[in-house]
UniProtKB/Swiss-Prot annotation:
It comes from Pseudomonas syringae pv. tomato (strain ATCC BAA-871 / DC3000). Keywords: Lyase, Metal-binding. The lineage of its organism: Bacteria, Pseudomonadati, Pseudomonadota, Gammaproteobacteria, Pseudomonadales. This is Putative 4-hydroxy-4-methyl-2-oxoglutarate aldolase. Its EC number is 4.1.3.17, 4.1.1.112. Catalyzes the aldol cleavage of 4-hydroxy-4-methyl-2-oxoglutarate (HMG) into 2 molecules of pyruvate. Also contains a secondary oxaloacetate (OAA) decarboxylase activity due to the common pyruvate enolate transition state formed following C-C bond cleavage in the retro-aldol and decarboxylation reactions. One of its GO terms (biological process) is regulation of RNA metabolic process. The keyword Lyase applies.
Length: 162
């Protein structure tokens, strides 16, 4: 499905919240959307690895990495696993790496920046809790839509207007 966030904002002004303009598109999909799954971790992508190995059909993984710019929470190998398991995309409040490969992967990826160093792997983090960044709170089970215009969230699923 192709989403256009300005059209969704116009059609559903009472439902959508717009994430502050701080994320950039790194994935092979320019637009993506789905039900939110949340994860909170700081400079440790162990739980990201676990989640992308699960079925992600119709889902978007929202990763609150604390805004760290000191390591990447997603690279080409995990992105490939996410695409293989049907994830629509990932939104990362942190960094990614292997950006040339990410751009060729059939996956939506929005993140703060690229950084070549990988994260630690200590198994530290939390799943399925509300996470807040970019001026909005992402809640598990709600919906996220993203394109090159930005990222929006809604408590219920949205359909593109005719």
């Amino acid at each position: 499905m192709h989403y256009i966030t300005p059209d969704l904002c116009d059609a559903y002004p009472e439902l959508v919240q717009v994430v502050e303009p701080m994320l950039s598109n790194f994935g092979g999909r320019d637009s993506f959307g789905g039900q939110i799954v949340t994860l909170k971790c700081f400079e440790d992508n162990s739980l990201v690895k676990e989640q992308v190995e699960l079925d992600g059909k119709g889902k978007v993984l929202v990763v609150d990495g604390g805004g760290s710019l000191r390591c990447a929470l997603l690279g080409d190998m995990l992105a490939e696993k996410a695409a293989k398991h049907g994830w629509e995309g990932l939104v990362i409040y942190g960094c990614v790496r292997d950006v040339d490969m990410l751009a060729q992967t059939d996956l939506g990826v929005q993140a703060l920046a690229s950084y070549p160093k990988r994260s630690e792997k200590r198994g530290v983090g939390q799943l399925d809790l509300p996470v807040t960044f970019g001026g909005v709170t992402f809640r598990p089970g709600e919906y996220l839509y993203a394109d090159n215009n930005g990222v929006i969230i809604s408590p219920s699923p949205l359909t593109m207007p005719e």
